[in-house]
Amino acid sequence: MKDYTNEINAAVRTLGDIAFKEASRTCPVRTGRLKRSITLRTQHDRAKNADSCVIGTTVPYAPNVEFGGRGRHPKPFLENGLEAARKSTVLIFSLFMKGDQ
């Protein structure tokens, strides 16, 4: 049986990139600080031989923008990125598993 670890890790990294790009694209911009603070970090767990992606921001007001607060309506941008990756998951994994990436 073939080991698909490399293909799975590549698909995870691609989905992380999709989520990052969509979060950046849909991030509300007033000064641009929030949008510039969005980062994508890929991590590799050697014990599991598995990649993971973390997308986020360290701007203190990011949760108030994402979820709303104090009379402000939510303006999700990280959730938009997650949703874009979720919608692409089956397609991306099928392409990488077939070798069509």
Can you annotate each of these PLM segments?
Residues 1-101:
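Short, Lys/Arg-rich flexible segments
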